[in-house]
């Protein structure tokens, strides 16, 4: 009986079962006589971030006769991460695994163990919250796994599942919602939960979020991405977004968001200039976008869109249909801060260098587009087979000319970029901030930086 045992007794028994194992976090003593008979002791091990290596540690007995230590399908999947012994005369001997899995008593036992585990965790959380928080890093993967795979456990665990922020503070879901709801709800009513999976690597993004008064969670566990997706499904108008997925103003859009004041031609020019120096390889795709950030913010930064990155991360552990995403190249966005002094200087340099050559090209493109627009306007109420072939041919020829002129203009900006060290330096700074600058490119950056100094 539990009342007859001391903590030392439980520890001694664990060492007998697992002589080379680390001391467990704590234990649960099962002692049930209705509606079935069951005794047992389950231990919470210090779970590592490798689920597969932690299974098959529960020994199943019937009247002290060993039945199996492979309990998947007999107890809920997440409970296979526990260690310990279960003994019940209601578990039939000498039967197949499939029979055990479908046996009514076994199902009741499984459900009861799930409830006892959840109740024990809730009890520890309420009575010894500080101790619970201290052990959270070891408990986390176990609890998250249970929430993802067992709906009844999820319903209980949501009360004691914890979130840790970058300041090292712990919160329940309800506590954290109360903390951030007023400040991190966007203009469409979505509550945005910001998170990082690497606080050191994403430091600058975290600081940008904190500068806005936002809070950032640490979600660096093996199952955190999967849990975030499930929580989004269960909680309407809530989104989990990594801090480096976009500029902070775009992640949490407000009604007073600043707008980019560059013209379309100016944006195209800067886009061509930066594309000329961005890495080109089959595993990574880059595109350029613009944001009107604070003048003190970084001139350029690299972000990775939340949805595609999350799908690739989930594909790495799930496989199956998700493997489609795993085979796709990484997609990155170089965000240009149009309010930064360096970007304004770069735009002026480009104008002085190639502006006279670009101006007549822009004029010719504008004329050709006016012609195309006029023809389309004249034919807007006609079906395709009613439009004169001469009009179709003229539209095609003019569009071909426009495409070639755009290429000519892009080539001018590309040549400018190759001769402007500032462009390469800005791109490399953004890559370096994302730990994406390596090898020869990193060496060249260091040499160039020395010359700038």
Where are the predicted features?
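Conserved GHKL (Bergerat-fold) ATPase module
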Residues: 1-453
